[in-house]
A protein has these predicted regions:
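Conformationally flexible catalytic loops at phosphate/diphosphate-handling active centers
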Residues: 1-8
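Beta-strand/loop-dominated core regions that host nucleotide or nucleotide-derived cofactor-binding catalytic loops
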Residues: 10, 17, 26
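Conserved alpha/beta-domain cores
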Residues: 35-243
Length: 243
């Protein structure tokens, strides 16, 4: 039998590590433990700058169960719920009801804390096994995220209906990924308005003034920030893609 050790920070795998490698990994484990213990001291402290400005410290999560960590680490809410994991962890497109229950669970668990739900962000390095995407030379800047949703309006509407319905149970916001033009943003907002009208006709409760924001992760969007600011309620800087 082989003995395997893993460095979770670098992704390195050691098969039958030497005594020296075991010592090094043990020291790394202890160092990480100490760093975590050091951070624990700040859990219940107020988050503000030296000159007194309040700063919201929000978590990024990928599944509803992560809300337990949000609460235990005293975060002030969720700045990014990666809804694509609901799709990636499913054998088929999640239904409106399945999504609604997931978003509702997060909203209720966090009560009135802010929760920002990013709409489906696939493409690039994130694929769905049940949805075929075109092969591209540079998929990170190609057919992905909001572009896929605007081409598949029924898919987009299903998710928006679920988010809006769940917004009746907490402080939810909608965030649109990889928006590259004002036209894309306006088209998405029009679809959201259409869904609102449908829900009103069906007498289904939702937060009528739900905030809509965008991810700024394309250089052209960053350059046009002032124009985009007139069309949406907030930005989230997507440094991974932007840089």
């Amino acid at each position: 039998k082989d003995f395997i050790a893993i460095n979770g920070t670098t992704g390195e795998i050691f098969v039958n590590p030497t005594e020296e490698e075991c010592v090094e990994l043990g020291e790394l484990k202890e160092k990480l433990k100490q760093e975590k213990e050091e951070l624990e001291k700040y859990k219940n402290k107020e988050t503000k700058t030296i000159d007194g400005h309040k700063v919201e410290l929000l978590s990024n999560i990928g599944v509803p169960e992560d809300t337990e960590l949000v609460i235990s680490n005293t975060a002030e809410g969720v700045g990014l719920f990666r809804s694509e994991f609901l799709y990636m962890n499913s054998e088929n497109f999640p239904t409106e009801e399945q999504q609604f229950m997931a978003y509702k669970k997060i909203a209720q668990k966090l009560q009135n804390k802010k929760v920002v739900i990013r709409t489906l962000d696939i493409g690039g390095d994130k694929d769905l096994k049940y949805m075929e995407l075109p092969k591209e030379q540079n998929p990170f800047l190609g057919y992905r995220a909001i572009r896929i949703c605007l081409d598949n309006i029924a898919l987009f509407k299903t998710q928006i209906r679920a988010i809006l319905r769940a917004s009746a149970f907490g402080n939810l916001s909608i965030m649109l990924p990889m928006v590259s033009s004002i036209e894309e943003l306006r088209e998405a907002k029009d679809i959201i308005e259409d869904v609102k009208k449908e829900l009103e006709k069906q007498n289904i409760a939702f937060k009528k003034d739900i905030k809509i924001g965008i991810m700024v992760e394309i250089p052209s969007t960053a350059i046009m920030a002032e124009e985009f600011g007139k069309e949406c309620d907030f930005f989230s800087i997507g440094t991974n893609d932007l840089i």
